[in-house]
Amino acid sequence: MICRATGILTASFAFFALAGSVVAHADEQRHHALSLIGEPQYGPDFKHFDWVNPDAPKGGTLRIAALGSFDSFNAYSIKGEVANGVGALLYDTLMDGSLDEPSTAYGLIAEWVSHPDDISSVTFKLRDEAKFQDGEPIKVEDVIFSFKLLKKINPSYNKYYKNVVSAEKTGDRKVTFSFDMKGNRELPLILGDLPVLPKHYYDGKGKNGKVRDPEKTTMTPPLGSGPY
């Protein structure tokens, strides 16, 4: 689990040193952040976003106001009415945007990101310390599972990732997404927004003895990777 609250990169997360802004390594360049507009505001060694209070109290109960009701904690199925905030608060993404600069994202689950000059693909290297809430490490298999699952069960994600033709494990902690086009600088950021779901959780069985179905509604709080 990497500490984050509604997209906030906290001091707890930033304690882990980010990879260099651009670090040459063989035939790849590693980036700690990606931006469509100029250079990222924060360097590779920043401790927290300027608008974050690293000394803010931690713990307690978070209450979120919402209109209406809900009948599901499954944030990604098209069925039912999902509880407000479930997706953003329960699941971390490969990268996370800052609230004080546009079109820029920093590594969250991903330690660094790289892509060739023609942007025909993008590679994310996962942090060794990234874990789900049950202590299981976040693996490349979880990333690939999440990508394929979201495309399958949710038309919005299927459209969102329409230019992504494959997701492959390309190293012990590396996953590479290949595109059907070149030169689109936004595609790496789109993949960075991928929420990562636990494959082992959905491969397992619930208290009713049945395999958990990610397409159905559920009132059982799911296993996530975020701070709540």
Please tell me what each predicted stretch does.
Residues 7-20:
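Bacterial N-terminal signal peptides
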